[in-house]
């Protein structure tokens, strides 16, 4: 879910690294706000995965949109809390997918979600963040009651100097009949006035925070390249080829990004990349694997506009 990163002084930007649901943070900077201050952030991201070949024949592609909004309030000098909402929609098209019997395993996938952010500032540069969230992930026609993902990201970071913050955390989630636990490594390292190494993503049910190398040549433009891993599950249509089953998409998206700061609080991100090590999986309603199919490197594109006030 969208939430402030545990890292201080992060820039605000967002984009979906792939149709799988990777995304950049669309929240206000994690720097401490004045007590009583409230920041609202909204974003919208159209996304696309171009044609990718399937190992046993056929290909597939998809388009979608991600919309999000968050509100963060600084209650005391050391405590801030916020709420965020998000909705993802994906539309998939399959051409002669032999591994799935020539029939599209899924078509329209929805992922609405809601999350909280709780952030504590300690002494000597320490910060702790808890981000509980709940999400419904389902194909059109599926039972939403059987499509719930829930859990939390917990992280602690320490600022060692004005140019270096490091931290560790974990994501713990129950994702449609499967428990997932994964580590999170937090980095915000200003290598020079123009170069920085940082986490581009908000960790959540689909995976960790990734890593990005950022170049800032001036006040308006920013260029970056990075990657992460992503895996997400969703409940399938009750009347589809695998009634009430579970679909899964796994991949390692790598990308380049160009971002333009349109004003003090608005930003446009243009992203192009490729999804590597991709796999599609279909399980039956009892979570027994039926089909696992690798797909070729898939070109991915995304555009995000976001603003805060």
Name each model-derived stretch:
Residues 30-97, 200-201, 216, 221-226, ...:
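Short glycine/proline- and aromatic-enriched beta-strand/turn motifs that initiate or cap beta-hairpins
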Residues 34, 73-77, 120-124, 158-162, ...:
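Outer-membrane beta-barrel strand-turn architecture
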Residues 44-50, 85-93, 134-140, 170-176, ...:
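Transmembrane beta-strands of outer-membrane beta-barrel pores
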Residues 63-69, 110-116, 132-136, 148-154, ...:
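Hydrophobic, lipid-facing positions within transmembrane beta-strands of outer-membrane proteins
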Residues 77-81, 124-128, 162-168, 194-198, ...:
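Repeated loop/turn-to-beta-strand initiation elements of outer-membrane beta-barrel proteins
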Residues 184-194, 256-264, 293-309:
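Outer-membrane beta-barrel "beta-signal"
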